[in-house]
Amino acid sequence: MVSTSSFQTTKSEEIFAAAQKLMPGGVSSPVRAFKSVGGQPIVFDRVKGAYIWDVDGNQYIDYVGTWGPAICGHAHPDVIAALHEALEKGTSFGAPSVQENILAEMVIEAVPSIEMVRFVNSGTEACMSVLRLMRAFTGREKIIKFEGCYHGHADMFLVKAGSGVATLGLPDSPGVPKATTSFTLTAPYNDLEAVKALFAENPDDIAGVILEPVVGNSGFVLPDAGFLEGLRELTKEYGALLMFDEVMTGFRLAYGGAQEKFGVTPDLTTLGKVIGGGLPVGAYGGRQDIMEMVAPSGPMYQAGTLSGNPLAMTAGIKTLELLQKPGTYDYLNDITQKLADGLLKLAQDAGHAVCGGHIGAMFGLFLTAGPVHNYEDAKKSDLVKFGRFHRAMLERGVYLAPSQFEAGFTSLAHTQADIDRTLAMAKEVFSHL
């Protein structure tokens, strides 16, 4: 592991300097630029299990997990072997494959709301498509989303969004027409009364409600008791649809996702990350009567050249097979609870104002006394202190998300020893932060 005395990132700095001349900000996604934590971003070279190595040879315990997909650990040998076999048959068919059928059946069996599923190439694409479907099915144009919830970078979702938008402090994005966002109504997360008011003002205009059932893109925020159930009742009352964006929570909180964990079944669900086993993927699914509106069965058009490609399907199949093993989610919950509780106690013992928690294999720590129920609460965090915390942990061989407004992830590859070492490093950092 890295020690602070030997920590150096000369090669990362050289590569990133070159990248800035080639790509906007030197990255392919904004949060990777370390803007909210300061310092130079790390350029990585390889991954294995719970670990990630940079181009300078530094090794880290990884709690980013390629932003969620690596729930079985990086480069799991079973996934790699399955991909090698699939590669021999070709990288893409642009036509139906048996792998699509197998993964579709696994998803339908696992996720309570999904009776039919369509594969796409990213979570953004899944959310774009499902919004069009919600409007097509209901004949209505408006949607309700929640402040700080991120559903990809499509125009209609860049209204009080989370993730990179929150990280960079942008209220929205230039280039998004006001006419587009006028159909997007927003409410604070966990505020059922605000949602009731929006429905009362627009009783016949709202196609549906879209949300992260557990927020991971403005930090880690759990739903208050009764919030998800209240949304389910309201959408039924007004003839609107309820959509869970489970791109992050799907197969991570439980095999059936957040909807299994909380016992609330939406009409539609988006997935991504885990179901591709580390390869680009997305999916949307739900009730059969709604999904049959999707072309070619119905009139709502959506298509994709690489959708359902055999490599992503193969990696997804093998990943879900690994997750089906007995004890998987008990182990994930146990190590994540140990980590989250440990970080919270260490910070509090050192006199820092913090709050946080975990659910399944997902966790978060806010540098504010809290509690955090929504995006406005999350924004009270001490971002300067978080930047120092992130850098100090990085120098000690622990890679956390480079933003206060992103959740953390554990995997089956993380050991008790990894958690113990992480907490030992955190104790050292909190004592001097």
UniProtKB/Swiss-Prot annotation:
Pfam families listed in its UniProt record? Aminotran_3
Please tell me where this protein is predominantly located.
cytoplasm
Check the record and name the NCBIfam families matching this protein: hemL, PRK00062.1
For this entry, the protein name equals: Glutamate-1-semialdehyde 2,1-aminomutase
Is Cytoplasm one of the keywords UniProt gives this record?
yes
Task: Give the record's keywords alphabetically.
Answer: Chlorophyll biosynthesis, Cytoplasm, Isomerase, Porphyrin biosynthesis, Pyridoxal phosphate
Q: Which reaction does it catalyse?
A: (S)-4-amino-5-oxopentanoate = 5-aminolevulinate
Which InterPro entries does the protein's record reference? 4pyrrol_synth_GluAld_NH2Trfase, Aminotrans_3, Aminotrans_3_PPA_site, PyrdxlP-dep_Trfase, PyrdxlP-dep_Trfase_major, PyrdxlP-dep_Trfase_small
* UniProt record, GO biological process: chlorophyll biosynthetic process; protoporphyrinogen IX biosynthetic process
The subcellular location is: Cytoplasm
This protein's pathway: Porphyrin-containing compound metabolism; protoporphyrin-IX biosynthesis; 5-aminolevulinate from L-glutamyl-tRNA(Glu): step 2/2; Porphyrin-containing compound metabolism; chlorophyll biosynthesis
Task: Identify a single GO molecular function assigned to this protein.
Answer: transaminase activity
Stored PROSITE patterns: AA_TRANSFER_CLASS_3 (PS00600)
Signal peptide positions on this chain: none
Q: Which family does it belong to?
A: Belongs to the class-III pyridoxal-phosphate-dependent aminotransferase family. HemL subfamily.
User: Where is the PTM N6-(pyridoxal phosphate)lysine found along the chain?
Assistant: 273
Q: What Enzyme Commission number(s) does the record list for this chain?
A: 5.4.3.8
Q: Which gene encodes it?
A: hemL
Q: Name one GO cellular component term.
A: cytoplasm
Keyword S-adenosyl-L-methionine listed? no
Question: Which cofactors, by name?
Answer: pyridoxal 5'-phosphate
Q: How does it assemble?
A: Homodimer.
